[in-house]
Curated annotation (Swiss-Prot):
This is 3-hydroxy-5-phosphonooxypentane-2,4-dione thiolase. GO terms for molecular function: acyltransferase activity, transferring groups other than amino-acyl groups; fructose-bisphosphate aldolase activity. Involved in the degradation of phospho-AI-2, thereby terminating induction of the lsr operon and closing the AI-2 signaling cycle. Catalyzes the transfer of an acetyl moiety from 3-hydroxy-5-phosphonooxypentane-2,4-dione to CoA to form glycerone phosphate and acetyl-CoA. NCBIfam families: PRK08227.1. The gene is lsrF. Belongs to the DeoC/FbaB aldolase family. It comes from the Bacteria. One of its GO terms (cellular component) is cytoplasm. The active site is at K203. Its main location: cytoplasm. Disulfide bonds: none annotated. Keywords: Cytoplasm, Schiff base, Transferase.
Length: 295
């Protein structure tokens, strides 16, 4: 029996209006498949096209480093305040409740330690397991200028090929070769190579001079590494300068979980990244939040 809806007149087909197609505006990602864009849209805030990632994957080569002795005590209280979690699959399965419902960037390279050559890494996670864990991206180091440069680039290529097959973005993390200087020229080289190999976004270090050239010459989003622990005002200054010079976010670990007020620091970093607070304003915000956190 025909439904009345089939013969009813007066439907609005919008014949006078062309269909609107919403473009995905994240840098360099407009032509990616839907699944890839969907995962990236969970990592990068669709309104700001920026992200704040909480890195606590250090144990994959450093073991129980300061601040990460007990993930459940030091990191779990920060889950609610970050945009993204960056960790290993071991910690994800054992320490992160599925109900946390935060996008995850999964550490997918390893096979080394602080006692050996750091650049000697392999792909340490099968793409099928990353999919099983429902993560939003996988991450691997790329060591340009190191003894194992070719191997690290090949790791990125393998992950990119598998990621393209399944709609999984790849984050390339620029490690520093022993013979290379930490300057804009080196990080421009490393970041560009990672992007050319197909990484959908790149994590690199902020440099005092020429960082705007690093971001400008990389065709995909760059997030900065937090690096070693700095005084809070210096870390916030670094965040602000990086965002001002074209970074699409930060991936911070030690400058968050080793802070005297970690949750306040994480909130202050988000203020810089998403609300464009300058370093002075963010530091004042941190001081105010710190009082409440330490009560």
């Amino acid at each position: 029996m025909a439904d009345l809806d089939d013969i009813k007149e007066g439907k609005d087909f919008g014949i006078d209006r062309p269909q609107q197609n919403t473009l995905y505006t994240l840098k360099g990602c407009g032509s990616l498949d839907w699944g890839m864009q969907s995962r990236l849209a969970r990592i990068f805030n669709p309104h700001s096209n920026r992200t704040v990632m909480l890195a606590f994957d250090h144990g994959y080569f450093q073991g129980p480093t300061t601040g990460l002795e007990r993930i459940d005590l030091s990191i779990a209280p920060l889950f609610a305040d970050t945009d993204v979690l960056m960790c290993t699959r071991g910690v994800l399965r054992s320490q992160v409740p599925a109900a946390t419902n935060k996008p995850v960037v999964l550490r997918a390279s390893g096979g080394n330690s602080i006692l050996s050559e750091l650049s000697n890494e392999c792909v340490a996670v099968a793409m099928e397991d990353a999919l099983r864990l429902n993560v939003c991206a996988v991450a691997a180091q790329v060591y340009i200028g190191s003894e194992y440069e070719h191997q690290s680039i090949n790791n990125i290529i393998k992950l990119v090929d598998a990621g393209n097959r399944y709609g999984m973005p790849v984050l390339a993390v620029t490690g520093v070769g022993k013979e290379m200087t930490r300057d804009a020229r080196y990080f421009s080289l490393a970041s560009r190579i990672a992007a050319e190999m197909g990484a959908q976004f790149v994590k690199t270090y902020f440099v005092e001079e020429g960082f705007e050239k690093v971001t400008a010459s990389c065709p995909v989003p760059i997030v900065i590494a937090g690096g070693k622990k700095l005084p809070e005002h210096e870390a916030l200054e670094m965040c602000w300068r990086a965002i001002d010079q074209g970074a699409s976010g930060v991936d911070m670990g030690r400058n968050i979980f080793q802070s005297s007020a970690p949750r306040a620091m994480l909130k202050a970093v988000k203020k810089v990244v998403h609300e464009n607070l300058n370093a002075r304003e963010a530091y004042q915000f941190w001081q105010e939040e710190k009082q409440g956190e330490l009560k």
